[in-house]
Amino acid sequence: MAIQFRSLFPLALPGMLALLGWWWFFSRKKGHVSSHDEQQVEAGAVQLRADPAIKEPLPVEDVCPKVVSTPPSVTEPPEKELSTVSKLPAEPPALLQTHPPCRRSESSGILPNTTDMRLRPGTRRDDSTKLELALTGGEAKSIPLECPLSSPKGVLFSSKSAEVCKQDSPFSRVPRKVQPGYPVVPAEKRSSGERARETGGAEGTGDAVLGEKVLEEALLSREHVLELENSKGPSLASLEGEEDKGKSSSSQVVGPVQEEEYVAEKLPSRFIESAHTELAKDDAAPAPPVADAKAQDRGVEGELGNEESLDRNEEGLDRNEEGLDRNEESLDRNEEGLDRNEEIKRAAFQIISQVISEATEQVLATTVGKVAGRVCQASQLQGQKEESCVPVHQKTVLGPDTAEPATAEAAVAPPDAGLPLPGLPAEGSPPPKTYVSCLKSLLSSPTKDSKPNISAHHISLASCLALTTPSEELPDRAGILVEDATCVTCMSDSSQSVPLVASPGHCSDSFSTSGLEDSCTETSSSPRDKAITPPLPESTVPFSNGVLKGELSDLGAEDGWTMDAEADHSGGSDRNSMDSVDSCCSLKKTESFQNAQAGSNPKKVDLIIWEIEVPKHLVGRLIGKQGRYVSFLKQTSGAKIYISTLPYTQSVQICHIEGSQHHVDKALNLIGKKFKELNLTNIYAPPLPSLALPSLPMTSWLMLPDGITVEVIVVNQVNAGHLFVQQHTHPTFHALRSLDQQMYLCYSQPGIPTLPTPVEITVICAAPGADGAWWRAQVVASYEETNEVEIRYVDYGGYKRVKVDVLRQIRSDFVTLPFQGAEVLLDSVMPLSDDDQFSPEADAAMSEMTGNTALLAQVTSYSPTGLPLIQLWSVVGDEVVLINRSLVERGLAQWVDSYYTSL
C-alpha cells in the first residue's frame, strides 16, 4: 500500500496544482471586465474634474509606486471642478444606452454585436442613481483618486473594433462640429493623452476639457454602472491581477482612435451636472490609501496561498502517515496469523503425540493383561504334578525372600518376554503348560551380557524331581558336563568346575513365565545352588540328525560354546523377528514354549535345529519389511526363526530354525515356496565329542606371503631381531577389534571354566592381556612344579609365563578368525660377536625405528624353526631405509648373509 501511494503521489501533486492554477486563472479572468470598467469610471471622473485652464502637463508625482501617477489637478476642490464641468452641453439620454456596448467590445477585445440597440427612455434617473451608488458607496466599492488603478494598460485597442463602434454608434451619422470655446485636440495630443490615461489612470494636461473626452468618460461611467449592477462590487484581488496584466502588456497598447470625435453641444447639461455633482461628492469624502490596502491584500492573499499550500502538504503527509499505519497494521496482522498457525500446529502435534502414546499404552496394557491372564489360567490348569515340584525348590534352591509363586512373576512380564500371544499356538495343540521356576534365585540380578548364542544342539527335558538327588550322588565327571549354547559353568568354593545344566527338567520353563530379563551372568549362583546341580538324564532318544542325546555327557564343557554367539540377529528386522534371542537363555524359553505347546510328555519331545545358508541378496526378502515376513513364518509355523550373520563372512547369512519336527517342516515348506532357488539343506552340525580343544594347525595363522612386499606394523618386539607383526591392510584385520570387545564382555564375568588339567601344550585359550583385556593365546610350555605355563599371544605377539588358573577355555567361535600376529626374524642380522643376544641399545634403536609407523616387509627365507626371515624397510618422506642395514651401520649388529641358515 505504501509503495503504491509513493508512486502515485508525485504524479497526483502536479495534477492538483495544475487544476488549482487553471481555476484561479479563469476566476481572475471573469472579474477582468468589472475591474476594467470600474477603472474607466474613475478615469472619467478625473477628466470631469480636470482644470480647463491648464494647457500644459504638470509634473507627475508617484503617489502609488508601480501603479499610476496622479497630477496635482486631481486634488483640486470640488468647486473648481464644478465650474469647469458646467459649461459642457447636454447629451440625449439615448447615448447612455447605445454607447456602452461599444466600449465593452473595445475593452474585451471582441467585436461588438452589430444589431441596433433599443433605446430605453426613462432610465436616466435610474442610471444616475446607480452611478451615485457606485461612486459614493462604501470603501470596499469606491476607488480612491489618490491612487487610481491602471486598468487600461492591459487592454488592446484595435482599429477594427473602433471602427465598428463608430459605425454602430448613433453619433457616427452626425457631422463633427467643433463646439465654440472647446478647441479640438489634435490626434497626436489625444493619442498621447490616452496613453497617459492608460498608464496613469488620470489625465494631467489641460486637454481634459474637451467634449469628446467628457463624452467618452460618461459612456465609461454608464458601462461601469451596469457592471456594478451585475457584479455587486468587484474584488480587490481581481483588480490587482488585472493591474499586473496591464503592466506586462503596456507595450502593446494602440493609440487612441482619432475617428471618435463627438459633438459636445449635443451632451445634455443635466446629465453632466448630475455626474459632476456625484463625482464631487465622492471626491470630498476622504479615501484611504490604496497602496497600503493593496499591499495588505497581497500579503493576505500570499499568506492564504501559503497556508493553503501548507495545508495541502500537511494533508499529503497525513495521508502518507495513514498509509504507513495501514501497512504496519497489515504486517502486524500477518505476524499474528503466522503465530496463530504455529500455535495450531503445536497444539495438533501435541494432541497427536498424546493420542499415539495413549494408544500405545493401551495396547501394551491389553497385551500384558492377556499374557498375565493366560499365564494364570495355565498355572491353574497345572495339577498336582506342579505342586510336587514347588516344595522341593522352595526348600533346596529358593531363599525365604524369593519363595513367590510364578504367577506373580508372570503378571509383571514384559510383552517381549518370549511368551506367545493368544492365538499363536499351532492348530489342534492343547493350551501350553506353565511350570514353577527352579532357577528364580539364579535370575535375581540384572543382565550384563546381552550377547546371545545362536546355534544350539537338541535338548530333551527332564522332570524337576531330578533335583532332589543329593549332591554326593553326582557322578565324578560332573565337573566337565557338557553345556548347551546358553549354559554357563559355575564355580564352587573349592574352585572346582561344577557346570550348571539348566536345560533338563521343568526348570527351563521358568524363562517362559518369568518377567525378569535373561542373561548369561544371571545364572551365576551361590555354592548352595551348585551343590544341587542335577546330572544329565541317561536317554537314548535320537536327534533328527542321528546324534544320540546320551552322547552329550561325553562332550566337554567348551563344546557348548557356539560359533554364532556374537552374531547380529537383527538382519535388518525389528525386535519382533528376534523374539527372545537377546540373551544367553533364549533357547530354553523356546524349548519350554514348544514343549508346552506340544502337550506331550517332556521326556519324549525332540527339539530340532535347522540352519540354512541364505545369500546376502535374499536376506532382505526373507526378513521382510520391518521383519514382517519372519514374524509371519514364526506365527504360522510355530517355530523359532531368526537370521544370524556369520563372523567374518559377508556373502551369506544363516537362517536358524528351532522347534519340533512339525514346526520345522512347516517353516521350511513356507520358505521353499517363496524362495525356490534357495538351498534348504541343513548345515548345522553338533559339536564334536572331544574333551579338550585340540591344538590348531599352522594354517590358522595369518602368515606373510613369500616374495611379496606387504605393509605391516610391529606389535611386539622380543629383541632387535625377533618381532611380531600384523598385516593391518588384510581384510580380516578389522574383525580383530570386534573380537576383542566380545572376549572382554564374555571373560570379564565370573563363572567361565578354566583349562582342564593337566594343560595340553599348543592348546588355544583365553588369557589376560594388557589393560584388563582378554586375548587369544597358545600354550607353548608347561611347568607342573609351579603350576605355571608359558603362553604366546597369537594376535598381539609376545611370550608370557602365567598361572594356569588365570587361563580360561575359549569358545569355538572365538578361534574362527585367523591369528593376526605373525612371528618373524630379521634376515642377515645377528648380535655382535661377543654377545649371544642383542644389546639393550640395539633393542631401543629397533623400537625407535619401528614404533608407531607402517613398515614394508618381504619374506626372503625361513629359519630352521620355520619362522620367516624378512627384510624390513621404513619410509621416511621420499626415502626408504632398510632397517636391517641401519642396525649394522649404527654398530648395534653385524651383517651375516647366512646367519640363520648356518644354525
UniProtKB/Swiss-Prot annotation:
Assembly, per entry: Interacts with SLC8A3. Interacts with CFAP91. Interacts with CLPB. Interacts with NDUFS1.
GO molecular function, one term: protein kinase A regulatory subunit binding
Compositionally biased intervals (Polar residues): 107-116, 513-526
Region named PKA-RII subunit binding domain: 344-357
Gene coding for it: AKAP1
Localization of this protein: Mitochondrion outer membrane; Mitochondrion
Transit peptide location: 1-29
Pfam family, one: TUDOR
InterPro entries according to UniProt: KH-I_AKAP1, KH_dom, KH_dom_type_1, KH_dom_type_1_sf, SNase_OB-fold_sf, Tudor, Tudor_AKAP1, Tudor_domain_containing
KH domain mapped to chain residues: 607-671
Source taxonomy: Eukaryota, Metazoa, Chordata, Craniata, Vertebrata
SUPFAM superfamilies linked to this entry: Eukaryotic type KH-domain (KH-domain type I) (SSF54791), Tudor/PWWP/MBT (SSF63748)
Top-level division of the source organism's lineage: Eukaryota
PANTHER family: A-KINASE ANCHOR PROTEIN 1, MITOCHONDRIAL (PTHR22948:SF75), TUDOR DOMAIN CONTAINING PROTEIN (PTHR22948)
Modified residues (Phosphothreonine): T70, T447, T533, T590
Record's function text: Binds to type I and II regulatory subunits of protein kinase A and anchors them to the cytoplasmic face of the mitochondrial outer membrane. Involved in mitochondrial-mediated antiviral innate immunity. Promotes translocation of NDUFS1 into mitochondria to regulate mitochondrial membrane respiratory chain NADH dehydrogenase (Complex I) activity.
GO biological process: antiviral innate immune response; apoptotic process
Tissue specificity annotation: Isoform 1 is detected in thymus, prostate, testis, ovary, colon and small intestine. Isoform 2 is highly expressed in testis and detected at much lower levels in kidney, pancreas, liver, lung and brain.
Main location: mitochondrion
Protein's recorded name: A-kinase anchor protein 1, mitochondrial
GO cellular component, one term: cytosol
Segments forming domain Tudor: 758-817
Membrane-spanning ranges: none
Domain remarks: RII-alpha binding site, predicted to form an amphipathic helix, could participate in protein-protein interactions with a complementary surface on the R-subunit dimer.
Gene3D superfamilies per record: 2.30.30.140, 2.40.50.90, K Homology domain, type 1 (3.30.1370.10)
Record key words, sorted: Membrane, Mitochondrion, Mitochondrion outer membrane, Phosphoprotein, RNA-binding, Transit peptide, Transmembrane
Chain positions found as Phosphoserine: S105, S107, S151, S169, S429, S445, S573, S592
Compositional bias (Basic and acidic residues): 117-128, 187-200, 274-284, 309-340
